[in-house]
Structures are given as structure tokens and as C-alpha cells.
Amino acid sequence: MGAILESHSNIQILSPAMFAGSGFAPLRERFANRLIDTGINEAHTVTTAAGIAAAGGRPWVHIYSTFLQRAFDQIIHDIALQQLPVVFLVDRAGLVGSDGPTHHGVFDSDFLMNIPGATVWSPQNGNELQGMLLEAEARPLDGPLFIRYPKARTQGGAPTDFHTHEWLQKSGGSSLWVSTGALSDLMKKGENHLHLAQNWPFFDDFSAILSDFEEIHVFEESTGLGGLAGAVKALMAELDHSGKCITHKLPIAFIEHGPRLQLLREHGFNNLL
């Protein structure tokens, strides 16, 4: 992120009082005038970003997944409807462990993928996240881009080139596993296992890939009613796909505090980690 800010002086990062807990302190010291804490007001933050983008600037918004829902109206009316190029760094996507039910980021994927013109990315590790940041900086946008990443530490390393998807394993058979985000890195691999770095819109050949398999398993740190699982089911219906779609998801519940891996095991992923 520091390299991006150094090479692009017109990029500003806004955050509604969430920099402190997210490792941005060194960047705030180096780029004090370009990392703007807008206070605890998510809707105001997003509308401010819309104004900066409308004036020709390049705003990025850093915000926790669980608090992004407070700005849903502004995302639709002030950014998506206006086709403004705003990058959202959606921090703490998925289960966050000890922060508990107020901070689990399990709702945003369901509503983000229903916004016209939105693009949604979910990296499987820190290297892919770095590549996404570089791609977001270089790519011309005509709507919001959401990069969803978990509360976690990474060992660093070189960024990987951005690709919409990656085959983690491909060995024949009639079953396809589709996963996204950090789950792709954490879980056991299926005999045919596709990681979707770009959750939405689906890449061009995804329909053809689905048609090659009789049973589709979708893995997601969400309720599975919308989001990736819902979109896969809808696409299969459009294709008149005769196979089954089996979702591996979280329950519709406010999940308690606890270590992230423990919570995943207790809420639907016990045999997959």
C-alpha cells in the first residue's frame, strides 16, 4: 500500500475511525494528509469518497465489513448509481474470532453482489491481496470495487499477478469444489477445486466450467442465501444445469466469540479444515 501511495499522489484513503486497529499507523505517519480519519460515521465516509471521485480524485475507503452495511444506501445512490470509481478495502471479512458477533463480517457478500456495476474480490492469502491492490490501482473503474480480506497477519512476500480464478487442484471426476477468500487457503482441497478471487462478476468461462460437472460444492464464510453460493445457484438455474449445488456455509445466526478456526469448525466446516 505504501508503494501505491508513493507512486500515485492523487490516491486518498478514508476510514471511519478504523485505521488504528488495522495496521495503518506507519502509513498515517508517512502520508498524514492522504489518510483521512472521517470519524465514526460510515455513511458520511462513503459520501465523502463519492464527492472526491466526482471531482476527479481517486478515493479508497478502508472499512470493516460489519460496519459497511451502515453505508449501504450511500454505496448504491452516491457511488454505484453515479458509476464512480471508488475502491473499498473491506477489512475483517468473514469470522473475526475474539471480536465476536458485533464484528463478524458475514453479511456484506450477500448485498454487495446485488449492486449493479459492483466488482467483488476476495484474496486467499496476503500475496494475492497485494496483487489485488496493484491491480486496483492500475485498472480503470466505472463503479465500486470491493476487496474483502480477513482479520489476519501475513508473512509478506511478493505480490502475485491478479487472476480472476485459480485451479487449486484438478484431477478428473464429476464433482467441483468452488471456494473463495481465505477459506481457499485454509481448507482441504477437493479433487477439482476452483478458487474464485473475483466473486463477482463471474469470469467468462465459468458457465462452461460448471457445465462440465454434475455436482457443485460452494464454500463461503456467509449464510449462503445470497453471496457466492446464491449467485452460483442462480447461474445454474439460468443454464438449466441438471446437477446439484451443495452449499457449505455459516448458519443464519449471530455467532459468538472464539478463535476463528474453532468457530469455523463449530459452524459448518469441521471436516474441511
Give the label of every model feature segment.
Residues G56:
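Conserved G/P- and acidic residue-centered "switch" motifs that form tight phosphate/ATP-binding loops
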Residues T48, P59-I63, F72-I76:
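Catalytic phosphate/nucleotide-handling subdomain of diverse soluble enzymes
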Residues N41, I63-T66:
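Short, glycine-rich nucleotide/cofactor-binding loops
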Residues S122-P140:
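Conserved glycine-bearing catalytic or ligand-binding loops at nucleotide- and phosphate-handling centers
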Residues M1-L5:
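Flexible inter-domain linker/hinge segments
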Residues R34-V46, P59:
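Active-site cofactor/substrate anionic-group-binding motifs, chiefly glycine-
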Residues E6-I11, S15, A20-E29, A43-T45, ...:
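Thiamine diphosphate
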